[in-house]
Amino acid sequence: MGSLESEKTVTGYAARDSSGHLSPYTYTLRNKGPEDVIVRVIYCGICHSDLVQMHNEMGMSNYPMVPGHEVVGVVTEIGSEVKKFKVGEHVGVGCIVGSCRSCSNCNGSMEQYCSKRIWTYNDVNHDGTPTQGGFASSMVVDQMFVVRIPENLPLEQAAPLLCAGVTVYSPMKHFGMTEPGKKCGILGLGGVGHMGVKIAKAFGLHVTVISSSDKKKEEALEVLGADAYLVSKDAEKMQEAAESLDYIMDTIPVAHPLEPYLALLKTNGKLVMLGVVPEPLHFVTPLLILGRRSIAGSFIGSMEETQETLDFCAEKKVSSMIEVVGLDYINTAMERLVKNDVRYRFVVDVARSNLDK
């Protein structure tokens, strides 16, 4: 993808080690190829998986690392073969920026499951340069892994949809969890969970939020629009709710028992795992086989599904609940995220930070 054009130097906020502390970092973008677009970043959401990568919790982090995979910006340059986008258009970049394009997953519009997928950050581009994410002034991205932001969708609202939004939209479409009136449980009410409530309601489902305490009950019911709220530590209420749900989307990103939630499913019910949990999870098989229940997993979504998510949310007027912060606040935001002290997604106003000035 090389070219003779001059190199572009940009500034981002990078972690230098597993402490995860982010500070200004200047680096060179890879050269623009014929199918690349250069995106000036305007907003970038903060995801829990950013913490996982920054702190090397999976044991595969490379530093310096500029996180951020819920990127919204404007196209400033395009390669000679770019047909999808024009300079000046608002676009989004999600969790992946490359794949092999020849395997069965890629050919089946499931690029997120390609074994050679390239992560938006903490990975290596085809040309050998490291990928860096959206906590930076600009990015170079292959047009195939860029989506268009609908005109009636506020840019800051679009950012969480590029990860949290498509993470729930994709399994709902794939597993047929879109029939109005069906009962869906949302386990965990964080960034992904709150989008689960909103998108499930937009599909016409009856939504029950399941949480470990009643701290978010009023907000879940009155603000997010959930139909019911279940405290998992209330054994009596959990028993009353047994075999009442058609589906559960499990968004919890830490180790937790599965048995209490499998018991909530009807016959043929599905528990879909969405959280990245590095420890083993345990359950007893009778809870599955005596109700023909199933446990499945789902990972973000394809590029096609990501565009669908944006278009669906724009059409249905589905908004994310966000707190917009500047890059000068980003380390505090990360500390608050560890404590689950955000309703429900931080979005960084990157453009306001004037990184390259």
From Swiss-Prot:
Lineage: Eukaryota, Viridiplantae, Streptophyta, Embryophyta, Tracheophyta
UniProt xrefs under SUPFAM superfamilies: GroES-like (SSF50129), NAD(P)-binding Rossmann-fold domains (SSF51735)
Name of protein: Probable cinnamyl alcohol dehydrogenase 2
Binding site for Zn(2+) 1: C47, H69, E70, C163
Listed EC numbers: 1.1.1.195
Cofactor note: Binds 2 Zn(2+) ions per subunit.
Gene3D superfamilies assigned: Medium-chain alcohol dehydrogenases, catalytic domain, NAD(P)-binding Rossmann-like Domain
Subunit structure, as described in the record: Homodimer.
Cofactor(s) the record lists: Zn(2+)
Sequence positions that bind Zn(2+) 2: C100, C103, C106, C114
Record GO biological process: lignin biosynthetic process
Binding positions for NADP(+) per the UniProt entry: 49, 167, 188-193, 211-216, 251, 275, 298-300
PANTHER family listed in its UniProt record: ALDEHYDE REDUCTASE
InterPro entries reported in the protein's UniProt record: ADH-like_C (IPR013149), ADH-like_N (IPR013154), ADH_Zn_CS (IPR002328), CAD-like (IPR047109), GroES-like_sf (IPR011032), NAD(P)-bd_dom_sf (IPR036291), PKS_ER (IPR020843)
Catalytic activity as recorded in UniProt: (E)-cinnamyl alcohol + NADP(+) = (E)-cinnamaldehyde + NADPH + H(+); (E)-coniferol + NADP(+) = (E)-coniferaldehyde + NADPH + H(+); (E)-sinapyl alcohol + NADP(+) = (E)-sinapaldehyde + NADPH + H(+); (E)-4-coumaroyl alcohol + NADP(+) = (E)-4-coumaraldehyde + NADPH + H(+)
Gene: CAD2
GO molecular function per UniProt: cinnamyl-alcohol dehydrogenase activity; coniferyl-alcohol dehydrogenase activity; zinc ion binding
Keyword annotations of the record: Lignin biosynthesis, Metal-binding, NADP, Oxidoreductase, Zinc
Pathway(s): Aromatic compound metabolism; phenylpropanoid biosynthesis
EC category name: oxidoreductase
Summary of the function given for this chain in its UniProt record: Involved in lignin biosynthesis. Catalyzes the final step specific for the production of lignin monomers. Catalyzes the NADPH-dependent reduction of coniferaldehyde, 5-hydroxyconiferaldehyde, sinapaldehyde, 4-coumaraldehyde and caffeyl aldehyde to their respective alcohols.
Keyword Zinc: yes
CDD domains, per the entry: CAD1 (cd05283)
Family (UniProt): Belongs to the zinc-containing alcohol dehydrogenase family.
